[in-house]
Amino acid sequence: MILPIYVYGQPVLRQVAEDITVDYPNLKELIENMFETMDHADGVGLAAPQIGLPIRVVVINLDVLSEDYPEYKDFRKAYINAHIDVVEGEEVSMEEGCLSLPGIHESVKRGSKIHVRYMDENFVEHNEVVEGFLARVMQHEFDHLDGKMFIDHISPLRKQMIKGKLNTMLKGKARSSYKMKQVK
């Protein structure tokens, strides 16, 4: 089922999400709905707060990029109770967008290497060192779990330049090709 994506201004996007337990109701269905919602909106990642749930669940699908990044062929994963323990390596700038900020794309600096811990869909714990583009996507999505958005990483000048677009979202007048839940 395709769910509405919560847009900038929705309070849940600024909450710190909670860990969940193995008995969280309908988790498999939730994860499938998140993948379907993300795919429908042409995203590569989606965090539960973006569909209104303040829980630490993220889905990432990089298979759509496999022409440019062959290493991501068939890459489709769910991350439960995800945390980044260390960010290191060279800081790299790259343009980012976000399904919760339709129409906004800005250059964001992020570390090129991270140490992450999470559980998979079967609640098996993983500790990994991740580099490159996946590290960027994970940092972006895991930020949502801590109540942050990529615009929190841009300069005050750049933020001032997108203020009009942000105000449009705060008025509930954002436009996109996918179903959204806007501020009323």
UniProtKB/Swiss-Prot annotation:
GO molecular function terms noted in the UniProt entry: metal ion binding; peptide deformylase activity
Q: What class of enzyme is it?
A: hydrolase
Q: Where does Fe cation bind?
A: 98, 140, 144
Domain of life from the UniProt record: Bacteria
Q: Which GO terms describe its biological process?
A: co-translational protein modification; translation
Could you say which cofactors this protein requires? Answer: Fe(2+)
| Catalytic activity from the UniProt record | N-terminal N-formyl-L-methionyl-[peptide] + H2O = N-terminal L-methionyl-[peptide] + formate
Pfam families, sorted: Pep_deformylase (PF01327)
Which residues carry out catalysis? 141
Cofactor detail note? Binds 1 Fe(2+) ion.
Write the record's keywords in alphabetical order, separated by commas.
Hydrolase, Iron, Metal-binding, Protein biosynthesis
Entry's EC annotation = 3.5.1.88
Extract the NCBIfam families matched here: pept_deformyl, PRK00150.1-3
The record's listing under HAMAP family reads: Pep_deformylase
Tell me the function of this protein: Removes the formyl group from the N-terminal Met of newly synthesized proteins. Requires at least a dipeptide for an efficient rate of reaction. N-terminal L-methionine is a prerequisite for activity but the enzyme has broad specificity at other positions.
Which family is this protein grouped under? Belongs to the polypeptide deformylase family.
What name is this protein filed under?
Peptide deformylase
Organism of derivation: Bacteroides fragilis (strain ATCC 25285 / DSM 2151 / CCUG 4856 / JCM 11019 / LMG 10263 / NCTC 9343 / Onslow / VPI 2553 / EN-2)
Gene (name only): def
